[in-house]
Amino acid sequence: MRVCWNLFLQLQGWTIRDEFPYHLKKCVIAVGPHTSAWDFVVGLAVRSNLRLYHLNFLGKAELFKGRFGFFFRKVGGFPVDRFSNNNVVDQVVEKFNASETFILALSPEGTRKKVDKLRTGFYHIAHAAGVPIVMFSFDYDHKTIYSLGA
């Protein structure tokens, strides 16, 4: 499968700059900007390319309903009800504490729409779990993915 994802990145013209800090067994990956549904597909390809098979992500609850719910869970997704105050931070911190290796990727914008400020959940999760934050940036103009690691 890794070969297919690498071929996808190559055919689409994407390059990955910098190295992922593989010494980290636990971290929060903040990915931005989140402007396209293609971010998810490119993210899956990057995950495979970097061999981050145990990477998890948060996604809006609507993605996990219906026929694609199984797929999103299978690739590491956890549904989040963005309009409910159900203490997602505590739930995710529990997952960090229960696992020897746990990497969580999410978009600080929380949406594909243009926003004036980032949501701070990624910071609160990392702080409460005592794990570093690794930044990833998708530069669509230059088809380059940057990792600004810990």
Protein language model features and the residues they cover:
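Soluble catalytic domains of membrane acyltransferases
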Residues: 11, 15-150
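N-terminal membrane-anchoring alpha-helices
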Residues: 1-15
